[in-house]
Amino acid sequence: MSSPRERGKSLMESSGSEPPVTPSRYESQKRRDWNTFGQYLKNQRPPVPMSHCSCNHVLDFLRYLDQFGKTKVHVPGCMFYGQPEPPAPCTCPLRQAWGSLDALIGRLRAAYEENGGPPETNPFASGAIRVYLREVRECQAKARGIPYKKKKKKKPTPEMGGGREDSSSSSSSFSFS
């Protein structure tokens, strides 16, 4: 049996004689999402090549996916609007949950660049997509009576050395500026 390090190494240095490594669940889902989005673009009239894809196509795709959603989102006129656990069924629509859409966009954003798309033109990284996701999150939180609370980032305390256990490590000199 090989160690995790050796298995990871075989991913990077795979020869033709070794069996292919099974992709992770995330990688499989990312590939499936990428193929689904590509098929969606091909089914447009006229078909849209990936090189001409814009954030508007992505927004249309997200709206298209709503029809397959499983999350009840009460409309403002519904008597259960704002109730986390309504006592009876209603006719409000089922939608894609915000968390599912957010995760989908994250995977498609990564897949776009992995498939040769330049980061500067990544339609999944557009501000319009972030605004749409924020609106969906807020709308669903109000409709279900569950306030969304953003998790606060922990600030490193000065006495702990900025949150690093070993400030002499080589990674401490690298920064994204």
Curated annotation (Swiss-Prot):
Principal subcellular localisation of the protein: nucleus
An MF annotation (GO) of this entry: DNA binding
GO terms (BP aspect): mRNA transcription; post-embryonic plant morphogenesis
Alphabetized PROSITE patterns for the sequence: ALOG
Keyword Nucleus annotated: yes
Protein name: Protein LIGHT-DEPENDENT SHORT HYPOCOTYLS 10
UniProt KW keywords: Developmental protein, DNA-binding, Nucleus, Transcription, Transcription regulation
Compartments, as annotated in UniProt: Nucleus
InterPro entries the record matches: ALOG, ALOG_dom
Biological role stated in the UniProt entry: Probable transcription regulator that acts as a developmental regulator by promoting cell growth in response to light.
Segments of this protein annotated with the region Disordered: 1-31, 144-177
Protein family according to the UniProt entry: Belongs to the plant homeotic and developmental regulators ALOG protein family.
GO CC aspect terms: nucleus
Source organism: Arabidopsis thaliana (Mouse-ear cress)
Motif segment (Nuclear localization signal): 150-154
Bias kind Low complexity: ranges: 168-177
Pfam families to which the protein is assigned, alphabetical: ALOG_dom (PF04852)
Biased composition range(s): Basic and acidic residues: 1-10
Domain ALOG: 25-152
